[in-house]
């Protein structure tokens, strides 16, 4: 599968090998790459898809809910890989409902509700002194209420 993806993007053999080793090691998939994909758990399939996505160093990487199904280590590795890709002059566009991650990873954010664009701009401008979750709840007209449980 990974070779097929790299063939599509004409990734040279040497670069392909380096990328596979680096990414498979980072996502702890090295020992599993020769196994049938059908034997993978959901999280392993997600990691494989991410390795494929990063393996050709795209100028623009578009991901839909990339953190779903990942274990905590892979979660951290994905954030690092996204930052690394951006630091090399490329861009990552991803959707997520995990606003804490969006706030920490993104320098720009767009907030969409029911197909309507509520905000698009720098993360620091929308967040200010509040967290992105709080700002989002305010945009929704909802209030964050923390009620203590009886436990």
Describe each region flagged by the PLM.
Residues 3, 7, 12-32:
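Conserved ABC ATPase "signature" region
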Residues 36-40:
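Conserved ABC ATPase signature
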Residues 61-65:
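Catalytic Walker B motif of ABC-type/P-loop ATPase nucleotide-binding domains
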Residues 76-88:
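Helical segment within the ABC ATPase nucleotide-binding domain
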Residues 102-104:
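A short, surface-exposed alpha-helical micro-motif characterized by mixed small hydrophobic
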Residues 120-121:
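ABC ATPase "signature
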């Amino acid at each position: 599968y990974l070779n097929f993806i790299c063939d599509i993007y004409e990734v040279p053999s040497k670069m392909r090998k380096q990328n596979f080793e680096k990414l498979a090691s980072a996502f702890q998939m090295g020992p599993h790459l020769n196994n049938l994909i059908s034997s993978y758990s959901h999280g392993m399939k997600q990691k494989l898809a991410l390795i494929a996505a990063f393996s050709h160093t795209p100028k623009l990487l578009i991901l839909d809910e990339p953190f779903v199904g990942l274990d905590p280590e892979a979660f951290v590795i994905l954030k690092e890989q996204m930052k690394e890709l951006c630091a090399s002059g490329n861009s990552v566009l991803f959707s997520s409902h995990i606003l804490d991650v969006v706030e920490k990873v993104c320098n720009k954010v767009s907030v969409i509700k029911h197909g309507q664009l509520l905000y698009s701009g720098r993360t620091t401008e929308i967040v200010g002194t509040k967290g992105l979750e709080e700002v989002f709840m305010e945009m929704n007209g909802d209030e964050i209420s923390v009620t203590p449980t009886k436990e």
